[in-house]
Amino acid sequence: MFNSIRTKVLAGFSILIAVMMIYIVYVSISNANETNEIEGITEEELPILIANYELANSINAQIAAAQGYLLTGDSKYTETFYSYVDIASKNADFILSTSEADQFKPYYDQSVEWRSLIDKDVFQAYDPDNLAIAYQNLLVLEQRGNDISKGYETLAYSMRDQITTSGEHLVKVGKQNLWISINMGVILVILAI
């Protein structure tokens, strides 16, 4: 009889250990996947989202700087314009080094051309005695700049939606893991009895 009880106890503990090992492997794999997804969000997706928003704002600030220059002729506005060009270049370099470069490149190319046209057709065309040409050029280029800004915003919204979807997935997986943990705890208690 002693061997029989001993065998049953060993079998019970073996089952408990096996169930615990399966649970530990599942939790480890699940946590590793969640960690990878969170790292993807924080290290790539979120910075891309921010960079696209900053690029959209940069275009708008460049338009405002060009308008300020035409209104006053003060070179501080051209300096402001080019400081935003530098900010945009840093953000663009970052995005071009990511997986989103293909979607981003057309807007980037348009913005580079747009900035050179602002320089040539607005800043260099500026003549205090005849502002009409520079104003007309800016009106045309302002609309183009707004379109580029909206393109960057569209990319940002797309990335925002992607982050939201990833977040919803992480919440779902977290709830599943909680449910599994509770059930596993109940099963282990029952097996231990």
Q: Across the structure, where does each feature detected by a protein language model lie?
A:
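Cytosolic-side ends of inner-membrane transmembrane helices, especially those
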Residues: G12, I180, M184-I193
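Short, Lys/Arg-rich, polar N-terminal cytosolic tail immediately upstream
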Residues: M1-N3
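Amphipathic, well-ordered alpha-helical segments in soluble domains
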Residues: V27-S30, E34, S58-A61, A65, ...
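Amphipathic alpha-helical segments and their boundaries
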Residues: I5-N60, I95-S111, G145, S166-G167, ...
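Structural signal for membrane-spanning alpha-helices in multi-pass inner-membrane proteins
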Residues: I24-V27, G68, A192
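Alpha-helical segments in soluble extracytoplasmic regions
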Residues: S75-L96
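Polar/charged, Q/E/K-enriched amphipathic alpha-helical segments with strong coiled-coil propensity
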Residues: I38-I41, L71, T78, L96-Y157, ...
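Non-membrane, extended amphipathic alpha-helical rods used for dimerization/oligomeric scaffolding
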Residues: Y82, D93, E153, Y157-R160, ...
